[in-house]
């Protein structure tokens, strides 16, 4: 039975859904949507929990995605949701509040006051950016301040650019941004934390270094002006865009609460099949420390979905094998039929 994409009915307090789903996907970014599409096309019953806008929602366009280069993130998500319509995928706008493993091995996920049960759980909850506490920076995140030159560098190529940060990550990002423009300034905000070798690297390719504390960011696309970086005790700097590599944290506490192991960078640890340290629980996308590109997240979602579908196929075969060897009272072997199909 093919079901259109639909929201769940209003919950009744404390109700446990009787149906056992194949998969619950927590998170509807590119990774979760891609997994839902592949599982839906594999005739699996899926519940996709949305839970909010994608991390790239503030930017005006997503780039680097074949046939969709320059598409607005909201339009990209709307199209992905529409693509799920022919399949048995139910989309809920609410996120998961709680997850637990049941005594029978199934996973229970609380949405509002309702619990939904599934054989497999897939997290695609992403990460949250922790932005520096520079006045004016947060308001311009995605609108004059960016994290990925591969996503937003071309639109500013050849113009005056700045990289905010210090240490190894800023050194790497400044050298990368230099490929788009020969007018790059590194903003160390009072703490350069650069080794002499890193400083030589930057100066060798013409990256200027400003060590003064940054006071404020003004202007930018929000005001149809260049970004004006003001400093304490030094002249301001006008640039077309600022790039930075922010610290990040998990987008949801649920994987860790369920016992999924995190690596030393705080990312959910997965194997080559996207499975976490908890059997039957998978994780995909930015939350695993994979390269943070839309196409990479979508590919990981598709890969995990194929692994999950294969696992479910094998589990059904093994279940039928065990049923076949059950004997009735007369001692004759009998093969139990598979569960009836919804179609």
Question: Where on the chain are the PLM-derived regions?
Answer:
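Residue-level detector of alpha-helix initiation sites
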Residues: 29-30, 129, 168-169, 288-289
């Amino acid at each position: 039975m093919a079901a259109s994409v639909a929201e769940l009915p209003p919950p009744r307090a404390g109700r446990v859904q009787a149906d056992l789903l194949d998969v619950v996907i927590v998170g509807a970014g590119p990774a979760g949507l891609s997994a839902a599409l592949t599982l839906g096309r594999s005739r699996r019953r899926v519940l996709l929990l949305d839970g909010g806008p994608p991390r790239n929602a503030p930017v005006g366009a997503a780039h680097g995605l074949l046939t969709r280069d320059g598409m607005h993130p909201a339009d990209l998500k709307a199209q992905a949701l529409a693509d799920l319509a022919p399949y048995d995928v139910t989309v809920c706008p609410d996120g998961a509040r709680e997850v637990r493993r049941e005594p029978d091995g199934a996973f229970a996920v609380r949405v509002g006051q309702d619990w939904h049960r599934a054989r497999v759980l897939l997290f695609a909850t992403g990460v949250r950016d922790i932005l520096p506490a520079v006045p004016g920076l947060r308001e311009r995140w995605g609108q004059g301040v960016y994290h990925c030159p591969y996503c937003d560098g071309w639109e500013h190529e050849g113009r005056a650019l700045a990289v905010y940060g210090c240490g190894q990550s800023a050194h790497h990002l400044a050298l990368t941004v230099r490929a788009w423009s020969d007018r790059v300034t590194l903003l160390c905000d009072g703490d350069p934390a650069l080794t002499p070798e890193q400083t030589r690297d930057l100066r060798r390719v013409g990256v200027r270094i400003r060590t003064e504390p940054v006071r404020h960011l003004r202007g930018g696309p929000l005001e149809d002006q260049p970004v004006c970086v003001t400093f304490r005790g030094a002249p301001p700097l006008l640039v077309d865009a600022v790039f930075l590599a922010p610290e990040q944290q998990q987008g949801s506490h649920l994987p860790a609460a369920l016992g999924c192991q995190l690596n030393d960078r705080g990312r959910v640890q997965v194997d080559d099949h996207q499975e976490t340290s908890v059997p039957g629980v998978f994780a995909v996308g930015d939350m695993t420390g994979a390269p943070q590109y839309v196409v990479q997240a979508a590919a990981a979602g598709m890969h995990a979905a194929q692994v999950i579908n294969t696992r479910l196929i094998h589990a059904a075969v093994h279940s039928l094998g065990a049923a076949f060897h059950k004997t009735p009272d007369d001692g004759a072997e009998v093969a139990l039929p598979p569960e009836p199909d919804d179609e």
